[in-house]
C-alpha cells in the first residue's frame, strides 16, 4: 500500500483518483503531478513501483502544501480575518455565511439547529 503525505492510498483505484485522497490535491492537481512525472493516470496504485511512489512523494513534498500544513494555513487565514475585525472575520466569528448568502431563510448548516421560540404560559388575561 502506497503511503504519501501520511495518507494510505487505496490499492485498487487508479492513481489519478487515489491521489485525491490527500487533502489539498484534487483531480486537476493529481493530473498535473502524474503528467510531470510521466506516469500513466490509469495505472492502479498497487502497480506502481517503489521508485514511482518515491518520485510522487518528493514532488508533493517540494511543490505542494497538503494535509496538516494546508489545514494550519487555512485556519490561520480565518483567525487573521477574525483578528482584523473585517466583515468576513465578523461573519466567521458569529458563525454565519461568509460569502453573501441570504440568512432570512436557509443557512441552517452554518447557523446550526433552530432554537425553539419561547411561548407565553398564561395566554390572554380575562377581566
UniProtKB/Swiss-Prot annotation:
PROSITE patterns: RIBOSOMAL_S13_1, RIBOSOMAL_S13_2. Coiled coil: none annotated. This is Small ribosomal subunit protein uS13. One of its GO terms (molecular function) is rRNA binding. Belongs to the universal ribosomal protein uS13 family. Residues 108-127 have a biased composition (Basic residues). GO terms for biological process: translation. Part of the 30S ribosomal subunit. Forms a loose heterodimer with protein S19. Forms two bridges to the 50S subunit in the 70S ribosome. Keywords: Ribonucleoprotein, Ribosomal protein, RNA-binding, rRNA-binding, tRNA-binding. Residues 95-127 are annotated as: Disordered. One of its GO terms (cellular component) is small ribosomal subunit. Located at the top of the head of the 30S subunit, it contacts several helices of the 16S rRNA. In the 70S ribosome it contacts the 23S rRNA (bridge B1a) and protein L5 of the 50S subunit (bridge B1b), connecting the 2 subunits; these bridges are implicated in subunit movement. Contacts the tRNAs in the A and P-sites. Gene3D superfamilies: 1.10.8.50, 30s ribosomal protein s13, domain 2.
Amino acid at each position: 500500500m502506497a503511503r504519501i503525505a501520511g495518507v494510505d492510498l487505496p490499492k485498487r483505484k487508479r492513481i489519478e483518483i487515489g491521489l485525491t485522497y490527500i487533502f489539498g490535491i484534487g483531480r486537476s492537481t493529481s493530473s498535473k503531478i502524474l503528467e510531470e512525472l510521466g506516469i500513466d493516470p490509469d495505472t492502479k496504485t498497487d502497480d506502481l513501483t517503489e521508485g514511482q511512489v518515491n518520485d510522487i512523494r518528493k514532488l508533493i513534498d517540494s511543490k505542494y502544501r497538503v494535509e496538516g500544513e494546508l489545514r494550519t494555513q487555512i485556519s490561520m487565514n480565518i483567525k487573521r480575518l477574525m483578528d482584523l475585525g473585517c466583515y468576513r472575520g465578523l461573519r466567521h466569528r458569529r458563525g454565519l455565511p461568509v460569502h453573501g448568502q441570504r440568512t432570512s431563510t436557509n443557512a441552517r448548516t452554518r447557523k446550526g439547529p433552530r432554537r425553539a421560540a419561547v411561548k407565553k404560559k398564561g395566554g390572554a388575561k380575562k377581566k
